[in-house]
Amino acid sequence: MSDAILVGHVGDIEDEEALVVPRADTGYGDDIAVFFSAGKYRALDDTCSHEKASLAEGWIEGDEVECPIHSAKFSLCTGAALCLPASVGVRTHLVEVRGDELWLHPGVPALTAEEGS
């Protein structure tokens, strides 16, 4: 588990857009995509589990992101694969809003942190 890192500020990511936080900045094994959609910030491993594509470059709608290569969809809330060709989900990461700052907790699953487990 890594320490939280400042990745931006509220308003830096437009609605249904994402930014990529490079693994070199987080110490985590994959780049992490931070999404803003439906009024919430969410983070997932950036690499699609089906092919080596950046999910941050995909199409974001509501609580889903669609891979730009083969149209696999993933839940922004749980990381679950929602349709083929992906059958394996991606990891979630906690994003915390502190004032107007966005803090990413690499390696801390979002649902676990939200549930307090």
Task: State what each model feature region is.
Residues 1-62, 76, 92-117:
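N-terminal pre-ligand scaffold of iron-sulfur
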